[in-house]
């Protein structure tokens, strides 16, 4: 024993070890570490003695602002793990710009840049092991329980990134997926392949994918390597979804995947069908599947992840999430762990085609109908049937709940009532889709707010890695319009989020994502690292010193300076973070004008805000302004 209940063991003459721990009969995931000194405590690795590390103080997420990066496209900290995707040649991505380029080392190196801009949380794309022709974004999982080796370096593991961010007061928001895996199977749900490679660069070829000997897949398709690509894809789905297209045997006997063949975007099949070729729909209503996914994702929470962004949330029934997933993650995460989901509704209205069951506000509520509370059983088929009934019960806007949690009572702040909340939030897609200009987005947000449990938790942005407000391109409205949009995001209710590079209007007007049909450098997912070369030291959120090289110029760009100012203002005014608001003409008159107030203990913060144009404020309480 060494120190406070620690045991020490030295492995001589090795550069890497793989190990597992068994505690009270429960086996950990396989753990891999390279040469060095490591501690393991409470399911977390550390390169420093945990007893010497200060626990990260996780605050209410509304106090934060979020900077969103595609990890592989942000900054290249270690050229040794750069690797092409299998389809890079089709996309014409050159050796100088492989799809897998940025990494955890790059994020660690540029934490001071993100903090200098003023952001206190970083949303990163999925970290789990992927497999597909174009998987640099992380949404095509092959193993939910492990981190993809293409992100990591010696001294820059995922744990190292989390710890380094926390040391600077920055949260890590992990993008996660439960709706689907990639189509090369999944290590637990459909084990068909393993990756064999001597160096990271070997992963640039599909030849690294080796059929697992003795697997059902190997026995069913012994000639897999001889099939043409179309039949290879059909063979993989035959095993995963039991399609019986190439073989009539029963393969997915545990029903780990949904077997539905049809999908319509505005019907219940949007939650049971396969949304894309590389997104094979997982049977989230199967308790065995839920147990596996919860164990995998709870392990990341135990590493110190501060929040989850749930991908493709609309494609999973709210009932399933409320029953199987949200309670588990919130319990593991503890105080101030935050979850927000992507309810992708590509319409300007807040009720998606007038169907609440696939609309953003709907996903912020707990179940209120007794027939759906604690209703799932071990029968996955019965659970699926219940989700279909749940969808039909919420297929019209009649009788949808409303809330005044985001509104002031006159000019008084009141304690929000979260008794009907499911404890999670969403990306404000209706607001996002209306950012053709700030006024439209602001108006839509005001119209939709009663239907969220509390819209002050909504994550708000102008554009992202998938869409701009016009659907296809990165925002191109000009610097002044960008500034006005940001003024709304940083002062109105919600948690502001900025997609990497927008501080420079990076790649403005170019197509956001075209798959492997053009070089990434011509899209909204281009590599940003050239603008980050040099050094900077963040002295606080939104302030810095010793900036040099390209990063100094980036931080001095007009929009970047504006963002720094907005972040400093928002951090200084609690009402702009967590306040309720009013637009009542008893107190305020103006196009985009409002009053926000937050009262808690000794804090009483009130802000009068006008975005652009004239405004008048009246009947305000006496105080120092």
Task: Give the positions of each predicted feature.
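Glycan-association/targeting regions that enable binding to alpha-glucans and other polysaccharides
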Residues: 1-54, 58
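Structural recognition of the beta-strand scaffold that forms the well-ordered cores
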Residues: 21, 65-70, 120-126, 143-146, ...
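Short boundary motifs at domain starts and secondary-structure transition points
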Residues: 55-60, 271, 449-451, 598-600
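Active-site-proximal helices and loops of the catalytic beta/alpha 8
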Residues: 39-40, 162, 166, 180, ...
């Amino acid at each position: 024993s060494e120190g406070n209940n620690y045991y020490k063991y030295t492995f001589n003459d090795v550069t890497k070890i793989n190990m597992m721990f068994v505690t009270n009969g429960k086996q950990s995931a396989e753990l891999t570490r390279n040469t060095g000194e490591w501690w393991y405590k409470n399911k977390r690795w550390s390169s420093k003695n945990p007893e010497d590390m200060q626990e990260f103080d996780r605050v209410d997420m509304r106090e934060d602002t979020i900077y969103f990066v595609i990890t592989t496209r942000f900054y290249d900290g270690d050229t040794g793990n750069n690797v092409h995707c299998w389809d890079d040649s089709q996309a014409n991505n050159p050796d100088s710009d492989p799809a897998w380029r940025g990494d955890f080392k790059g994020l660690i190196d540029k934490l001071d840049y993100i903090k200098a801009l003023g952001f206190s949380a970083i949303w990163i794309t999925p970290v789990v092991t992927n497999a597909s022709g174009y998987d640099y974004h992380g949404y095509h999982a092959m193993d939910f329980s492990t981190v993809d080796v293409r992100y990591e370096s010696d001294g820059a593991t995922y744990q190292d990134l989390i710890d380094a961010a926390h040391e600077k007061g920055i949260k890590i928001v992990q993008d996660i997926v439960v709706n689907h895996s990639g189509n090369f199977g999944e290590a637990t749900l459909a084990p068909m392949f393993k990756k064999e490679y001597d160096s990271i660069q070997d992963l640039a070829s599909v030849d690294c994918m080796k059929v697992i000997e003795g697997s059902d897949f190997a026995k069913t398709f012994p000639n897999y390597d001889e099939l043409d690509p179309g039949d290879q894809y059909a063979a993989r789905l035959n095993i995963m979804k039991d399609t019986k297209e190439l073989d009539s045997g029963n393969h997915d006997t545990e029903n780990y995947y949904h077997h539905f063949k049809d999908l319509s975007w505005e019907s219940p099949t949007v939650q049971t069908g396969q949304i894309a070729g590389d997104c094979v729909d997982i049977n989230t209503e199967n308790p065995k599947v839920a147990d596996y996914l919860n164990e995998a994702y709870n392990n990341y929470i135990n590493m110190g992840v501060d929040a989850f962004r749930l991908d493709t949330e609309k494609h999973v029934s709210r009932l399933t999430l409320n029953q199987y997933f949200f309670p588990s993650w919130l319990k593991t995460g503890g105080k101030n762990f935050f979850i927000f989901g992507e309810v992708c509704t590509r319409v300007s209205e807040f009720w998606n085609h007038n169907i609440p069951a696939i609309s953003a506000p709907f996903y912020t509520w707990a179940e209120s109908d007794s027939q759906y509370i604690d209703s799932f059983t071990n029968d996955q088929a019965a659970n699926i049937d219940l989700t279909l009934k749940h969808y039909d019960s919420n297929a019209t806007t009649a009788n949808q709940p409303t809330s005044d949690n985001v509104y002031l009572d006159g000019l008084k702040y009141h304690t929000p009532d979260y008794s009907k909340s499911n404890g999670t939030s969403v990306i404000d897609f209706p607001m996002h889709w209306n950012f053709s200009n700030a006024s439209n987005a602001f108006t839509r947000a005001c119209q939709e707010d009663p239907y969220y449990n509390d819209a002050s938790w909504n994550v708000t942005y102008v554009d992202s890695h998938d869409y701009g407000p016009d659907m296809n391109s990165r925002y191109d409205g000009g610097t002044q319009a960008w500034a006005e949009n940001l003024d709304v995001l940083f002062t109105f209710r919600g948690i502001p989020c900025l997609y990497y590079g927008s501080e420079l209007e990076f790649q403005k007007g170019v197509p956001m994502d075209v798959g492997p049909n053009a070089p990434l450098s011509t899209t909204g997912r281009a590599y940003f690292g050239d603008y980050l070369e040099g050094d900077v030291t963040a002295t606080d959120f939104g302030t810095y010193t010793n900036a040099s090289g390209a990063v100094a110029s980036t931080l001095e760009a007009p929009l970047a300076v504006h963002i720094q100012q907005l972040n400093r203002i928002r951090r200084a005014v609690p009402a702009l973070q967590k306040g309720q608001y009013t637009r009542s003409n008893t107190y305020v008159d103006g196009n985009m004008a409002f009053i926000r107030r937050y009262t808690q203990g000794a804090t009483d913060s009130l802000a009068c805000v006008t975005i652009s144009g004239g405004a008048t404020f009246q009947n305000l309480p006496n105080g120092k302004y």
